[in-house]
From Swiss-Prot:
This is Uncharacterized protein MG133 homolog. The chain crosses the membrane at residues 22-42, 90-110, 150-170, 185-205, 232-252. Keywords: Cell membrane, Membrane, Transmembrane, Transmembrane helix. One of its GO terms (cellular component) is plasma membrane. The keyword Transmembrane helix applies.
Length: 266
């Protein structure tokens, strides 16, 4: 009974704009997770490859950063007094991961539109994030249109809605426990990107779909560390840019949202 009352209180006793926005973003986050699961299942069925539920789908930074953001929103809805939300570090980290996703995928889209990067037909059906079709293009084919919708949703629509929540959240509550130590924040926030970078660089050596000339890599040619020695020239700067983004968000957060407000600590 107490849990039921608490749930009703959560949904109907709205304190501020942040709470109102949360009512929209929470189901939107569930839909976000549904889009990823549906895309992975479609990939499995279309290619008759059960392992694609992970490979090319949930092992991409796009899926993982969107999952982290959605889970953070749902956790905050259910357990906003959790110690993880005593300061803004968790939301700031999730926002950083999504910023990275948005920037680099849309740079890839721009490179495709301008013709700077061309992807061969043979990658179709193997890489959900790098396909032979032009990103965000709708042709009337249900399969390719779903891929385009999922790309648009995961790289533009949901990140924009999450960034809107972050802005309202920071503006409403500001710093309940200010983040003074940049190094400590980067160390904690950088754990996940570091682990992911390790996975990205090592998975081509695991002999997954390895024919002696090519093997599975999450982003095809761009992350093929086994058969493409030039990968290291751009992978190191890209990895460093993740920390640059986190640093920028830390500075912006402390600069504009550092003072406590009348809302105080929840």
């Amino acid at each position: 009974m107490k849990k039921t009352i608490g749930l009703a209180y959560r949904f109907f006793y709205l304190n501020n704009n942040c709470d109102f926005y949360l009512l929209f973003l929470a189901p939107f986050s569930l839909f976000n997770l549904g889009v990823m699961v549906a895309s992975a299942v479609i990939s499995v069925v279309y290619n008759n490859q059960p392992q694609l539920i992970w490979f090319t789908n949930f092992d991409t930074f796009t899926y993982q950063s969107n999952t982290i953001a959605a889970v953070c929103v749902l956790m905050y809805l259910c357990k906003r007094r959790c110690k993880l939300f005593d300061n803004n570090a968790l939301f700031l980290s999730a926002a950083g991961y999504l910023v990275f996703t948005v920037i680099f995928f849309n740079l890839y889209v721009l490179s495709r539109v301008t013709g700077f990067v061309n992807v061969e037909e043979h990658v179709k059906g193997w890489f959900s994030t790098i396909t032979s079709e032009m990103p965000y293009s709708f042709s009337g084919n249900p399969l390719t249109d779903w891929i385009s919708f999922a790309q648009l949703f995961l790289h533009v629509i949901y990140p924009a809605s999450f960034f809107g929540f972050i802005w309202i959240f920071f503006k409403t509550y500001k710093m309940r426990e200010p983040l003074h130590e940049l190094g400590k924040f980067l160390l904690k926030a950088g754990v996940y990107p570091s682990l992911y970078a390790f996975y990205l660089q090592t998975v081509p050596f695991l002999k997954i779909w390895d024919n002696g000339h090519d093997s599975y890599s999450v982003y095809g040619f761009f992350s093929q560390t086994k058969y493409n020695s030039y990968v290291w020239f751009w992978s190191i700067p890209i990895f460093a840019s993740m920390f640059l983004i986190l640093w920028g968000l830390f500075v912006i957060n402390n600069r504009y949202y550092g003072a406590k407000t009348k809302y105080g600590k929840q």
